[in-house]
Curated annotation (Swiss-Prot):
UniProt name for this protein: Adenylate cyclase type 5
Sites of Omega-N-methylarginine modification: 23
Family the entry assigns: Belongs to the adenylyl cyclase class-4/guanylyl cyclase family.
Biased composition regions of type Low complexity, renumbered to the chain: 121-132
GO terms for biological process, alphabetical: adenylate cyclase-activating dopamine receptor signaling pathway; adenylate cyclase-activating G protein-coupled receptor signaling pathway; adenylate cyclase-inhibiting dopamine receptor signaling pathway; cAMP biosynthetic process; cellular response to forskolin; G protein-coupled adenosine receptor signaling pathway; intracellular signal transduction; locomotory behavior
Outcome following mutation: residue 726 to T: In DSKOD; increases cAMP production upon activation of ADRB1
Gene coding for it: ADCY5
Organism lineage string: Eukaryota, Metazoa, Chordata, Craniata, Vertebrata
SUPFAM superfamilies: Nucleotide cyclase
Compositional bias ranges of the Basic and acidic residues kind: 25-37, 151-171
Length: 1261
């Protein structure tokens, strides 16, 4: 076994651990004192707070948090970044927490250590390296080759890979369900790639068809539960959208009623249907906003609303007079578009509704206007208008739904990552707090976050406690037990036994400090003071003796416990910078250790001080410890042996035992176990072992942690469901978003939102260009042709083609030259540039909608008819058109009244084209709602001015001709003229129609932007919480890696471990070093002048910190610090695949170089601290067993004969010399190291051994 049980100075019977001393000099900018912008071993934006992010009122995000969002903590599933020679993290914690040496003045640094620090400072001040882009995707071999990055053992890696694989599979399954169209054309592109085409080659026709079909596929998530969560996520927003749609539908119905009321006689069926539609919609609006309305009712409400719209459509087209194929186009377009945009239905339902509304209008127009000679032109134009409206609806609905599903998916992924980090963080916290008491761990983490003032010495984490009891226990006869077991069986035996001791310590209110070989020691009264600390230690000792007696019965080996207890004062805490372990120091600790050494097997040996705290509750007899231990005799310590409890104490213990049994029975009892591998199994039958182990109180291996068995996906969904139910959209909107402008109240938040890139901008431009084409076709169909029309449309087409081409390059950037790529990126990635391009595109579309009006005949038909009939213009009506000698009709394109300009008899199609241009405006989702409103109002103002001033005669003429056409149809050749054949003037209808559209489109734009901003905000808050959790996790991980090796920490964080679960590895060739300060015990004294010994410990902390800085250098990355024991420093190399060099033996040479470096450093320390410390170092190589004893309170260590001999090389060594064994000599001599033979040395347990002194490294060539 390891010789680490030795105690070097008075009060140093225990192992030391490392403490951080965060320092913040000018060259140490980060919270950990690093010179570069790294935090917790991962890239961190400089200038950001190292603390967890602090939220401003209203949940706004600070600039530091935004920086942290830009450089996120890597998840624990990712492999560690490769460590290189200039990386301060190489080989472990290579940090200097002070700005200058404790051994020199605050001036220059002219020693070897100073130059080393300068080199490391220069390295750390270099450019910050980001983690590998692949995250955890790299191979272990690649990671191992990258500068000595450690690789987990295969046994650990398999479990982690399985867990990662499950997580990735779930993520991919969900990510694939976000949208069907985002990856459209994959099948075709992959097929083409096989034909030798380059990246982004021409897509096949099949791929294009698949891309189009993808749009109409269901976007449902594969999981019904996830789909319901998505519906719940957007339920309030959909409810608001549905209410808004009902309001605008009521407005449209009222406008239709007003138009009908303005042209008598009134038709009761028409009025009844529209009034009923308004009533039904209002009732539905009330029901939809009741508390009882939930997402299951949403579908019914949507389809009911579609039915109402269809009824209004049919009645609105069949009943009004005068008839016209252009009648009702504006509300049909309105109905179609609002179903796509404001009605929360699936794409296929929206498409079917739009097509059905279009078909109804076309069918009714064909039936009621079958005798019109010009009907074909109108029907073709109507088909183009409805087709364009449906396409624009699809182009609006599809990206909106995809964006919503992506926002939901990304938010869920943030929550999933946060919960994953939270689970791992809880495991880390549990593991961390099992090794370090809470107050020490919290102080360390606080110092990590806080910027420390520059100090000469590292901060030391030590507290003084005056009234405690210290228990040391050693297994007597352990050598005999060890001789009957292999090294692995011995480790398992110790693991099971000490796991039981840990459980007993918890029951008896004792804190286990450390395990040193077969020695176990604990303290009662830490960290919280207890008046009965002496009683707790005595009861702990009794339980330990009882537990070892069961081992004796099971194994048949004569083993026993020797227990020593002393009460007094201790200093507790950690020392150094690496491999922290909580420890205690003081002369009283030294005395307690000697009480164990001078005790008797199976008895509890106590001092007079402890007896005074027991208050006569135990019967004792004189211990005569001085007869068995020289230290006790030298210091005249009066000792006693516990005989038994008094009757009063027995009654108290019986009451406590009864309460424990009742608690156990209420929970249920499970069969105990020894673990999967039982070193004592062959000695007795299974039943007998079970019986004995039952008496020892081991747990059932079948017990599983409830959290482990829970499905993480269900946990994420449940958490998300609670968050959805808890969030208030109105509160979020009022707290963070301005009501009218819809901008964030926090400027930083608005800036971050504005920097979002919409990858679909090219699609928006393409859709607007498609609207332009439809408008062109409508105008060509319905308006007389002219050279101006042709030239204007060709010019606009070329401009739009260029804009589309440049915008689309962003999506397939690799196919085009670099200047075009740069131009496309500048347009798409800049909100201002993309908005300007969008406005330019919309302007061209708008111009195409009405510019042909200026080529039409503007003569007033009323004036011509008044002149012909010799009446005033106010007396002219439609009957005069029918009675005119001139054939004025809608089919006549020759100019009226002798005008050379052609007649445009259907000017309402200009209005419908303008409506399409307004729809094109709504396609650009990246333009703000206020921007769209300003743009649409400008379009409306310009067009209405044109209609009301220069184009008013055009619309008045059309009104006369439509009414006259209806009179001809109804008279059917008779001479009667119905005076009631009237029509609301187009110049009145047009501004109202456009205003209704502008209002509806603005409400839709506001809804879209509001949804996008709330999604952004919720995702940002979820990301922020995830970042805070990951930041805390990174701190904990950093602390853990200073306690356990990374591969070991990963093993224990993989899942909850049982108290007696074992982790170990067999290592075939490990170099082991023990380095002790031989005369430190002479230096350590407890005086009031040195704060009862604290200042001595402060100096020891500096020495250990210097050793830790040296082992952190890249050239020593193969080394692993094991622990410190008092003033003894223990390290080893070759403990895993990445550090073991079977051929070159570089790990052995690295340890020899490290030993020589420690000698040089000690000389430097002596020179600058005016001391004369003498070091003895022992080295050995051979096989060891590395593992962790106590899964719940893990302590990493190595065991085996190799370790014992290395310890003996130290203890039998000579001050200021490095003693090595023959095996070590052979390796070093073969590599031309300078050694000399010391001769034969007597070694305890080994007899005589030939040893050598290491004098220096290979001669320089």
């Amino acid at each position: 076994m390891s010789g680490s049980k030795s105690v070097s100075p008075p009060g140093y019977a225990a192992q030391k651990t490392a403490a951080p001393a965060p320092r913040g000099g000018p060259e140490h900018r980060s919270a950990w004192g690093e010179a570069d912008s790294r935090a917790n071993g991962y890239p961190h934006a400089p200038g950001g707070s190292a603390r967890g992010s602090t939220k401003k009122p209203g949940g706004a995000v600070t600039p530091q948090q935004q920086q942290r969002l830009a450089s996120r903590w890597r998840s624990d599933d990712d492999d560690d970044p490769p460590l290189s020679g200039d990386d301060p993290l190489a080989g472990g914690f290579g940090f200097s927490f002070r700005s200058k040496s404790a051994w020199q003045e605050r001036g220059g640094d002219d020693c070897g250590r100073g130059s080393r620090r300068q080199r490391r400072g220069a390295a750390s001040g270099g450019s910050t390296r980001a983690p590998p882009a692949g995250g955890g995707g790299g191979s272990a071999a690649a990671a191992a080759s990258a500068g000595g990055t450690e690789v987990r053992p295969r046994s650990v890696e398999v479990g982690l890979e399985e867990r990662r694989g499950k997580g990735r599979a779930a993520d991919e399954l969900e990510a694939g369900a976000v949208e069907g169209g985002e990856g459209s054309g994959d099948g075709g592109s992959s097929a083409d790639s096989g034909s030798g085409a380059g990246p982004g080659a021409v897509l096949s026709l099949g791929a294009c068809c698949l891309a189009l079909l993808q749009i109409f596929r269901s976007k449902k998530f594969p999981s019904d539960k996830l789909e319901r969560l998505y519906q719940r996520y957007f339920f309030r927003l959909n409810q608001s959208s549905l209410t808004m749609l009902m309001a605008v539908l009521v407005l449209v119905c009222l406008v239709m009623l007003a138009f009908h009321a303005a042209r008598p006689p009134l038709q009761l069926p028409y009025l009844a249907v529209l009034a009923a539609a308004v009533g039904v919609i209002l009732i539905m609006a009330v029901l939809c906003n009741r508390a009882a309305f939930h997402q299951d009712h949403m579908g019914l409400a949507c389809y009911a609303l579609i039915a109402v719209v269809l009824a209004v459509q049919v009645v609105g087209l069949l009943l009004p007079q005068p008839r016209s194929a252009s009648e009702g186009i504006w509300w049909t377009v309105f109905f179609i578009y609002t179903i796509y945009t404001l009605l929360p239905v699936r794409m296929r339902a929206a498409v079917l509704s739009g097509v059905l509304l279009s078909a109804l209008h076309l069918a009714i127009a064909l039936r009621t206007n079958a005798q019109d000679q010009f009907l074909l032109k109108q029907l073709v134009s109507n088909v183009l208008i409805f087709s364009c409206t449906n396409i624009v609806g699809v182009c609006t609905h599809y990206p909106a739904e995809v964006s919503q599903r992506q926002a939901f998916q990304e938010t869920r992924e943030c929550i999933q990552a946060r919960l994953h980090s939270q689970r791992e963080n809880q495991q880390q916290e549990r593991l961390l707090l099992s090794v370090l008491p809470r107050h020490v761990a919290m102080e360390m983490k606080a110092d990590i976050n806080a910027k420390q003032e520059d100090m000469m010495f590292h901060k030391i984490y030590i507290q003084k406690h005056d009234n405690v009891s210290i228990l040391f226990a050693d297994i007597e006869g352990f050598t005999s037990l060890a001789s009957q077991c292999t090294a692995q069986e011995l480790v398992m035996t110790l693991n099971e036994l000490f796991a039981r001791f840990d459980k007993l310590a918890a029951e008896n209110h004792c804190l286990r400090i450390k395990i040193l070989g077969d020695c176990y020691y604990c303290v009662s009264g830490l960290p919280e003071a207890r008046a009965d600390h002496a009683h707790c230690c005595v009861e702990m000792g009794m339980d330990m003796i009882e537990a070892i007696s069961l081992v004796r019965e099971v194994t048949g080996v004569n083993v026993n416990m020797r227990v020593g207890i002393h009460s007094g004062r201790v200093h507790c805490g950690v020392l150094g910078l690496r491999k922290w372990q909580f420890d205690v120091w003081s002369n009283d600790v030294t005395l307690a250790n000697h009480m164990e050494a001078g005790g008797k097997a199976g008895r509890i040996h106590i001092t007079k001080a402890t007896l005074n705290y027991l208050n006569g509750d135990y019967e004792v007899e004189p211990g005569c410890g001085g007869e068995r231990n020289a230290y006790l005799k030298e210091h005249s310590i009066e000792t006693f042996l516990i005989l038994r409890c008094t009757q009063k104490r027995k009654e108290e213990k019986a009451m406590i035992a009864k309460m424990n049994r009742q608690r156990t029975n209420s929970i249920g009892h499970n069969p105990p176990h020894w673990g999967a591998e039982r070193p004592f199994y062959n000695h007795l039958g299974g039943n007998q072992v079970s019986k004995e182990m039952k008496r020892m109180g081991f747990e059932d291996p079948k017990d599983k942690n409830a959290q482990e068995s829970a499905n993480p996906e269900d946990e994420v969904d449940e958490f998300l469901g609670r968050a959805i139910d808890a969030r208030s959209i109105d509160r979020l909107r009022s707290e963070h978003v301005r009501k009218f402008l819809l901008t964030f109240r926090e400027p930083d938040l608005e800036k971050k939102y504005s920097k979002q890139v919409d990858d679909r901008f090219g699609a928006y431009v393409a859709c607007a260009s498609l609207v332009f084409l439809f408008i062109c076709f409508v105008q060509i169909t319905i308006v007389p042709h002219s050279i101006f029309m042709l030239s204007f449309y060709l010019t606009c087409s070329l401009l739009l083609t260029l804009v589309v081409f440049v915008s689309v390059i962003y999506s397939c950037v690799k196919l085009f030259p670099s200047p075009l790529q740069t131009l496309s990126r500048k347009i798409v990635r800049s909100k201002m540039n993309s908005t300007l391009v969008g406005v330019f595109t919309i302007t061209l579309v708008f111009l195409a909608a009405f510019v042909n009006m200026f080529t039409c005949n503007s003569r007033d038909l009323l004036g011509c008819l008044a002149q012909e009939h010799n009446i005033s213009a106010s007396q002219v009506n439609a009957c005069h058109v029918a009675e005119s000698a001139v054939n004025y009709s809608l089919g006549d394109e020759q100019g009226f009244c002798g005008s050379p300009w052609p007649n445009c008899n259907f000017p309402e199609y200009f209005t419908y084209s303008v409506l399409l241009s307004l729809l094109a405006c709504s396609v650009f989702l990246q333009i703000s709602c206020i921007g769209k409103l300003v743009l649409m109002l400008a379009i409306e103002l310009i067009y209405v001015l044109i209609v009301e001033v220069p184009g008013v005669t055009l619309f008045d003429n059309a009104d006369l001709l439509v009414t006259a056409n209806a009179i001809d149809f109804f008279n059917n050749g008779t001479s009667q003229c119905p005076e009631h054949a009237t029509k609301v003037a187009l110049k009145v209808v047009t501004p109202i129609i456009i205003s209704v559209f502008v209002l509806a489109l603005y409400l839709h734009a506001q809804q879209v932007e509001s949804t996008a901003r709330l999604d952004f905000l919720w995702k940002l808050q979820a990301t922020e919480e995830k970042e805070e959790m990951e930041e805390l996790q990174a701190y904990n991980r950093r602390l853990l890696h200073n306690i356990l090796p990374k591969d070991v920490a990963a093993h224990f964080l993989a899942r909850e471990r049982r108290n007696d679960e074992l982790y170990y590895q067999s290592c075939e060739c490990v170099a082991v070093m023990f380095a002790s300060i031989a005369n430190f015990s002479e230096f350590y004294v407890e005086l009031e002048a040195n704060n009862e010994g604290v200042e001595c410990l402060r100096l020891l902390n500096e020495i250990i910190a210097d050793f830790d800085e040296i082992i952190s250098e890249d050239r020593f990355r193969q080394l692993e610090k094991i622990k410190t024991i008092g003033s003894t420093y223990m390290a080893a190399s070759g403990l895993n695949d990445s550090t073991y060099d079977k051929v070159g033996k570089t790990h052995i040479k690295a340890l020899a170089d490290f030993a020589m470096k420690l000698m040089d450093q000690m000389k430097y320390i002596n020179e600058h601290s005016f001391n004369n410390f003498q070091m003895k170092i022992g080295l050995n190589i051979g096989p060891v067993v590395a593992g962790v004893i106590g899964a719940r309170k893990p302590q990493y260590d190595i065991w085996g004969n190799t370790v014992n001999v290395a310890s003996r090389m130290d203890s039998t060594g000579v001050p200021d010399r490095i003693q090595v064994t023959t095996d070590m000599y052979q390796v070093l001599a073969a590599n031309t190291y300078q050694l000399e033979c010391r001769g034969v040395v007597k070694v305890k347990g080994k007899g005589e051994m030939m040893t050598y002194f290491l004098n220096g490294g290979p001669p320089l060539s």
